[in-house]
Amino acid sequence: MASQLVLRKADFFATPTQPVVVADRYPQNVFAEHTHEFCELVLVWRGNGLHVLNDRPYRITCGDLFYIRAEDRHSYQSVNDLVLHNIIYCPERLQLNVNWRDLLENPRGVNGDPRWRLSSQGMVQARQVIDQLEHESPKQDALSHCLAESLFLQLAITLRRHRYQPSGGTGPGEGETLDLLMAALGNSLDVPFDLQHFCSHYQIAERPLRQLFRQQTGMTISQYLRQLRICQAQYLLRHSSLLISEIAARCGFEDSNYFSVVFTRETGVTPRVWRQQWGALAG
């Protein structure tokens, strides 16, 4: 078995005291599973890809936010024009007297879901701070380190203020069209989603919404929802003893045979083979 790839501090931080660094991924390519000697925030700007975090797959796209601990294992697969920022930091180097743990701990939502979403307003504010942080963090003098840490604090507070978890039944509250749609899709893993009803409810034109969604994510709305459901099915196949028919129902598929066809088309193997590969309990 190959040894685990570990990303080292020395390869990313210019000095032993530098607290935070911005690593842009324009684009993020396929990247093998790895851990780190540091922690990171991952914020996705556009495109899509498969982010596998601690063996759980997530189809990620614009607005997705992850708090990654040093010991977390993750990789990027099946990327499509995926653009993101990694804000990497060393907790032991942070000097400001604030509750960093509360701001940066890996928070979990319903069912332990570590994925958060950032509202459109939050993305605009975060982008402005990250641009400043990217300019300041490479400087090696003490004042620059202090300013970089202050900007990092501002970013952490911005993320905390504007994040939400649609899978937990919450949404962005008052938000722009794409925020509302993402929240609705996140709450539709096991129930049908009616785009026409959604547009009527929020008085939104359907065609421009479809175009906006594809422009921002690189997918159609139905493709994205299908990917969310398949990722959920992969997780349940590995970590539960539910029958495959029960998993199909929990992932929005009324017909288990159709579920098997879609799952096989998306992953290359049948649900049963997927479960066997991971040594999960048989359905």
Swiss-Prot record:
GO terms for molecular function: DNA-binding transcription factor activity; sequence-specific DNA binding. Keywords: Activator, Cytoplasm, DNA-binding, Repeat, Rhamnose metabolism, Transcription, Transcription regulation. CDD domains: cupin_RhaR_RhaS-like_N. PROSITE patterns: HTH_ARAC_FAMILY_1 (PS00041), HTH_ARAC_FAMILY_2 (PS01124). GO terms for cellular component: cytoplasm. The keyword Calcium does not apply. The record marks 246 as: Interaction with sigma-70. The keyword Transferase does not apply. Gene3D superfamilies: Homeodomain-like, Jelly Rolls. Its main location: cytoplasm. Binds DNA as a dimer. This is HTH-type transcriptional activator RhaR. It comes from Cronobacter sakazakii (strain ATCC BAA-894) (Enterobacter sakazakii). The lineage of its organism: Bacteria, Pseudomonadati, Pseudomonadota, Gammaproteobacteria, Enterobacterales.
